[in-house]
Amino acid sequence: MSSSDSDSVSLSIRRRQRRGSSKRISMKESDEESDSSENHPLSESLNKKSKSESDEDDIPIRKRRASSKKNMSNSSSKKRAKVMGNGGLKNGKKTAVVKEEEDFNEIAKPSPKHKRVSKANGSKNGAKSAVKKEESDTDDSVPLRAVSTVSLTPYKSELPSGASTTQNRSPNDEEDEDEDYKWWTSENIDDTQKWTTLEHNGVIFAPPYEPLPKNVKLIYDGNPVNLPPEAEEVAGFYAAMLETDHAKNPVFQDNFFRDFLKVCDECNFNHNIKEFSKCDFTQMFHHFEQKREEKKSMPKEQKKAIKQKKDEEEEKYKWCILDGRKEKVGNFRIEPPGLFRGRGSHPKTGSLKRRVYPEQITINIGEGVPVPEPLPGHQWAEVKHDNTVTWLATWHENINNNVKYVFLAAGSSLKGQSDLKKYEKSRKLKDYIDDIRKGYRKDLKSELTVERQRGTAMYLIDVFALRAGNEKGEDEADTVGCCSLRYEHVTLKPPRTVVFDFLGKDSIRYYNEVEVDPQVFKNLKIFKRPPKKEGDLIFDRLSTNSLNKYLTSLMDGLSAKVFRTYNASYTMAEELKKMPKNLTLADKILFYNRANRTVAILCNHQRSVTKNHDVQMERFAERIKALQYQRMRLRKMMLNLEPKLAKSKPELLAKEEGITDSWIVKHHETLYELEKEKIKKKFDRENEKLAAEDPKSVLPESELEVRLKAADELKKALDAELKSKKVDPGRSSMEQLEKRLNKLNERINVMRTQMIDKDENKTTALGTSKINYIDPRLTYSFSKREDVPIEKLFSKTIRDKFNWAADTPPDWKW
C-alpha cells in the first residue's frame, strides 16, 4: 500500500475537498514481454502441405552424374546484382510526448554433455557417405533474379526536404554541434574511412591490490597461511564469492585452485598447499562481508562525496574528440582481475582473469596528437593511427584469448551509423528474399548432398531464426547453432514434426517442437542415417563459413545473422499491424509488449523466473485490493449523498472481490502506519533544512508528537467507518465523486494490465530483441502513430542508442 492511498482516505475523512485536474494514468516503463502465440514469419508460406510422398522418397541420393553437377554448378554461381534498400528517415512532425504524473508506482536441463566432432565436414568416425542422386522430385524453381542497382547512399534519398547538412549550418548551429550532431543527415557515410581526427585519454586501469589486515588469513589444514599479495588477492576473489552458487560448483573450484597454485608458484612462494578441501576461506569471507556492510551503512553525504570524486577522476576518460566533435566513450574501464564466471556450464568457469597492464594494450589515436600516458613505469604494446577502424584501444583477455575493444558509446555517431547500416541491410533483404527462398527450396531436392544440406540449413535459419552456430573446442561451452547441430539434437516424429533440443548461445536451452516442410523432414531423416550416431554432425558437409560465403554471393553483406534481424523486424512489423482500435494507453503498451514477446520467442530470448516473481505478483494483488477498497468507499460516499441511487444504480451496492471485514481491519492498520511514517519523514526533512540554516531552530520532538495525533484521528475515523458501514462524502459533490470513481476504475484496469504483462513476461526477455534485432524505427513510428510515449517502450539507454531513429515519422513503413 503506498502513501498516496493513505492520502486518499485521510483527506476524505477530514472532509478536505479534492481539487485540480485528474491525474493521468501512468504505466511503469517495462522492458518485459507478454504472451503471444508462436508466429514464425514464414511458417505459413513455407510449411504448406505438399503432395503425399511415396516410400521411394526415402531412397538415398544416388551417385551424381557429371553433367548434373555441371548444370547445377553453373546455376548456383549466377551473380546477383547489388541493391540498396529505400532506407533512411522520412521527415515527420514530432509529436509532443506528454509527461504523465505518477498515480501509482509499480511494486515492482541442460542437455547432457555430448561427444564432439573434431571436424566440421566429416562424421566422428571419419566415414563419408557417397554423394547420391535422389529419385526425381524436381521442382520448377526459378533461379534468383537480378535486382536493379541503386545508389550506395540511401540515407540522402529519405532526408527531409528542408534538412540542413554540415555544409550549410549557421554559426549558432555550429555552437551546438557537439550536442546535436545529426550524422544521419550527412550526405557522405564512408564505409572505409571512419574518422579524420581522433583524440582521447586512453583507459582506466583497475586500482592496485590492497592487502588484507594482518589478522585475516587463509586457513589451510587448521593453520593460518601468510600468502604473498599476488596469491592473497586470488584467494580473496574466491573468498568473496564463498556463499554463491558459483563457489559451490566443483568445476569452478578446480579451475580456481589450479590457477591459485600457479600464482603461488609464480611468486616463488614456498608452501604445502595441496588440497582444495583443506582450505578455509571463512576469515576472508567475513572480512569482505563486514566491508560490504560498512559501505551499505555509510552516510549519504559520504557516499555522495566518494561518487563525486570518482566521477571527477573518470571525467576525462568519458569523452573523446572525433573529427572536432566531443563524443562519449563506451567501456573505458579495463576489467579488473577476478574469477571468470562464464555463462551456462562453461568448462573454464572459476579460472583466473589476470590483471591487464599497458604492455598488453594497443592504442588507436589520430596522428599528431598527444598519446595517452600509460601507468607509471609501463608502456603501451603499440600505438596505431588507423582511421578505418572505430576502436580506441584493444587487447587479448587470457581466458579464451578473445580480443577486447574500447569503442565509442552506444549513442555515438560511429555506433549509430553501424546500427543504421545493419537495419538497412535487413530491409534490403526484402528485395531478395523471394528469390533466395526459391533458391534454397530448389536446393532441398538437389542431387548434391552439400547443396541439399545447405538448403535445409537455410530453411531452418529463415523459418525458425536459428543462429548459424560455430564449431567449438573442448575448452569452450558446448553451445550449438544450426550448422553445428548434432545427431542427438534433432528428433524426428512422422509425418513431419521435428523436435529441436540443444543449448544455444549463452548456454540457454533451445527446445522447439515444430512442423516442417515435408522435404525438410525427409532430408533430416537422410542426414541422420547410419553410420551416423550421437556426437556426429547433422550437416557434416556444411560449415558456418561456407554458408555465409554462399549467402554473400546471393546478396552483398548477407549472413545468417541478417536473416535473424530481417525476421525479427518483419515479425514485429506484421504484429504491430494487428493493433485493434480504441485501446487505452495501458492496453496499447500491453499489445506492443506482446508483439515484442513474439519476436523474443522466435529468437529464443529466454530468461529464468526471478526469485521474487511470486512476491511481486502478491504485491500487485494487494495493491489492486487497495484500489478496490478505495472504490468501495467512493460508492458508499455516493450512496450516503443520494440514497436513492441504490435502486437506479445497483452496481454501487456490488461487493468488491476479496474485500472482507478482516482484510479491512488489517488494511486500516496499514493506512495508520503509513500516515505516521509520512508525518515523520516530513518532520525529518523540515529539521534537516532548519539545521542547515540555524541549528537552534530545529523543531523539538514534542512537535512531532503533536503532529502524530493526526494519524491517531485517522485511525479512529477508520474504525468508526467500519462499525457504521457508512462513509462521509465531506464536501464532495456527486459530480466530483463520479469523476473520482471513473478515474479509480481506470487505475484498477491499468494495474491489472500491468500484472498480466509482468506475469506473461516472466520467462521471456524483451531487451535483447529491442537492442539487437528489431528495427527501432518500428517502435518510434508506433509510438507517434498510437500516441504512446516512447519512454513507455524504450528505456533511456535504448533511446540514447537509437537517437538517430527518433525523427521517424508515424507513417514510416519497414
UniProtKB/Swiss-Prot annotation:
Chain positions with Phosphothreonine modification: 138
Gene Ontology terms for molecular function: DNA binding; DNA topoisomerase type I (single strand cut, ATP-independent) activity
Domain of life: Eukaryota
Enzyme Commission number(s) of this protein: 5.6.2.1
Catalytic activity: ATP-independent breakage of single-stranded DNA, followed by passage and rejoining
Annotated segments matching region Interaction with DNA: 404-405, 467-472, 559-561
Enzyme class, first EC level, given as a word: isomerase
Biased composition (Basic residues): 13-22
Biased composition (Low complexity): 1-12
Signal sequence region: none
Residue span(s) of domain Topo IB-type catalytic: 411-814
Note: Eukaryotic topoisomerase I and II can relax both negative and positive supercoils, whereas prokaryotic enzymes relax only negative supercoils.
UniProt record similarity statement: Belongs to the type IB topoisomerase family.
Annotated function: Releases the supercoiling and torsional tension of DNA introduced during the DNA replication and transcription by transiently cleaving and rejoining one strand of the DNA duplex. Introduces a single-strand break via transesterification at a target site in duplex DNA. The scissile phosphodiester is attacked by the catalytic tyrosine of the enzyme, resulting in the formation of a DNA-(3'-phosphotyrosyl)-enzyme intermediate and the expulsion of a 5'-OH DNA strand. TThe free DNA strand then rotates around the intact phosphodiester bond on the opposing strand, thus removing DNA supercoils.
Protein name as annotated: DNA topoisomerase 1
Organism whose genome encodes this protein: Schizosaccharomyces pombe (strain 972 / ATCC 24843)
